[in-house]
Amino acid sequence: MSALPLATDYARIFLDDVPLIDLRAPIEFKEGAFPCSTNLPLMTDDERAQVGTCFKQQGQAAAIALGHQLVGGAVRAERLEGWLAQLRRQPDAVLYCFRGGLRSQTVQQWLHEAGVTRPRIAGGYKDLRRFLIDTLDGAAAECQWTVLTGMTGSGKTHMLAEVAQALDLEGHAHHRGSSFGQLPGGQPSNINFENNLAIELLKRRHQGEQAFVVEDESRLIGRCCLPNPLFDAMSQAPLVVVEVPQEERAEQIRQDYVHDLWLRYQAMFGAEEGWPLFAAYLTDALARLKRRLGDQAHRELDTLMQSALAEQASSGDTSLHLAWITLLLTRYYDPMYLYQLGNKRERIIFQGDKQACLDFFAKQRA
């Protein structure tokens, strides 16, 4: 087995989007993998668990023997055909298991005996993951970071779409970063969030980019946690403050979190099934703020929200949502933002309206 080829240029694998065949069990794949990987496991979750138990109780030799017993005969033939079929679709695919050990060595040998020789990752998933963590850490330490901040509803995410050097953290997290930030479809695992972020940074730095603009985020974007080195770099980075009137911000929130999000629920689930899910999303998001708002303020806001939802369900009109949105900005989000900004004013390098901030970023890049 040792004479068969190894893949060791991890940067090139990610830069070129080399297809990967992940031979780990489905439970391992679900915890974290890579965007170009396909899970075609050597063993099922149950088979892996049996082999693991055998290893603990009887040692390596017995565990290997059990593995060959479980994945032998017709099972081996069926799985081998699955790997061969994938390699017919993606003939340049590379194999990996967790550590580059027996699982990937075994499959590599079986494929070789079937007439197909493909490299395996020398250190497996563990080495690829370490490479991407180091990539993130290096980017956090070596790149120039600028943070775009502004009151809730300022349209910062929309602005970043017009900034060439923007890095969309919320896009990678599939979450808008507030109590109302949950999006239909759920979030990636934290490992996948980090992996995808690292790969984007690797590719962009390979193209020569060294300066990035990110939106002001807390450590957690939904359930996705920013890597400590990146969060620390953002916490010390210069700030650009976008200034938007409250009326305009309330309208932006209505558009993003009511009108557009309802369309996403409708597209994903259909109108009949999607409506109660959408209404529950808004209601639950407000409920998560109850402790900070206090019972009375929460009741007042919830009453306004339920009236707005009833009108929307009846007529399709979403304008009543502006009442609770404006009150929530006034009572909660705006005071919280002003307090937080007061603790970091010394980091502000520019502030102005949307166009002024976009012009600043364009000049910064030039």
Swiss-Prot record:
Reactions that this protein is recorded to catalyse: 5-methylaminomethyl-2-thiouridine(34) in tRNA + selenophosphate + (2E)-geranyl diphosphate + H2O + H(+) = 5-methylaminomethyl-2-selenouridine(34) in tRNA + (2E)-thiogeraniol + phosphate + diphosphate; 5-methylaminomethyl-2-thiouridine(34) in tRNA + (2E)-geranyl diphosphate = 5-methylaminomethyl-S-(2E)-geranyl-thiouridine(34) in tRNA + diphosphate; 5-methylaminomethyl-S-(2E)-geranyl-thiouridine(34) in tRNA + selenophosphate + H(+) = 5-methylaminomethyl-2-(Se-phospho)selenouridine(34) in tRNA + (2E)-thiogeraniol; 5-methylaminomethyl-2-(Se-phospho)selenouridine(34) in tRNA + H2O = 5-methylaminomethyl-2-selenouridine(34) in tRNA + phosphate
Keywords: Selenium, Transferase
GO terms assigned for molecular function: transferase activity, transferring alkyl or aryl (other than methyl) groups; tRNA 2-selenouridine synthase activity
Cystine pairs: none
Membrane-traversing stretches: none
Residue intervals of the Rhodanese domain: 14-137
Any Gene Ontology biological process: tRNA wobble uridine modification
Active site (record annotation): 97
Coiled coil feature spans: none
Major enzyme class: transferase
Enzyme Commission number: 2.9.1.3
InterPro entries, per database record: P-loop_NTPase, Rhodanese-like_dom, Rhodanese-like_dom_sf, SelU
Superkingdom of the source species: Bacteria
Description of how the protein assembles with itself and partners: Monomer.
Sequence similarity: Belongs to the SelU family.
Function description: Involved in the post-transcriptional modification of the uridine at the wobble position (U34) of tRNA(Lys), tRNA(Glu) and tRNA(Gln). Catalyzes the conversion of 2-thiouridine (S2U-RNA) to 2-selenouridine (Se2U-RNA). Acts in a two-step process involving geranylation of 2-thiouridine (S2U) to S-geranyl-2-thiouridine (geS2U) and subsequent selenation of the latter derivative to 2-selenouridine (Se2U) in the tRNA chain.
Official protein name in the record: tRNA 2-selenouridine synthase
The species this protein was found in: Aeromonas hydrophila subsp. hydrophila (strain ATCC 7966 / DSM 30187 / BCRC 13018 / CCUG 14551 / JCM 1027 / KCTC 2358 / NCIMB 9240 / NCTC 8049)
Gene: selU
